[in-house]
A protein has these predicted regions:
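RNA-contacting regions in translation and RNA-metabolism proteins
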Residues: 1-130
């Protein structure tokens, strides 16, 4: 991206959330296209080669962008910190462009869903012991 974006936490806390009304298919496509475009622009700087970005709607209505490709560990980072930062950037950029907040999850080859399953399994086993 050639433009500099001023990143500010206040952007993510705007009162212009879209939670009141569901988005039309065209609006959802625009949100997805905007987020994917921003993600592709940022991925150029990681030199990860050819990647595929799958988009789908999560259980809670969020837009999930799942990146697949070869040797993507650099996108996850230590304890998922790089992936969290990437998700934050994509959310901020998308909010700036579309004008309202829409939940976006950036994942790498299902990393976040695997981590969630591990945590749920640990919680169940801890609950049984208690």
């Amino acid at each position: 991206m050639s433009e500099e974006l001023e990143i500010n936490d206040q952007v993510l806390n705007q009162e212009t959330d879209s939670a009141d009304e569901p988005l039309s298919d065209e609006e959802l496509d625009f949100v997805a296209d905007t987020a994917i475009s921003a993600l592709k622009d940022i991925l150029k700087y990681f030199n990860v080669g050819e990647v595929t970005i799958d988009e789908y709607e999560g259980d809670d209505g969020e837009l999930i962008l799942d990146i697949t490709g070869d040797d993507l560990a650099v996108l996850i980072g230590r304890h998922g910190r790089t992936l969290d930062a990437l998700q934050f950037l994509i959310s901020v950029i998308t909010v700036r462009i579309i004008g309202f907040r829409y939940p976006i999850v950036v994942d790498v080859e299902g990393y976040k869903s695997r981590q969630r399953q591990k945590l749920e399994s640990l919680a169940r086993s801890s609950a049984k012991k208690a």
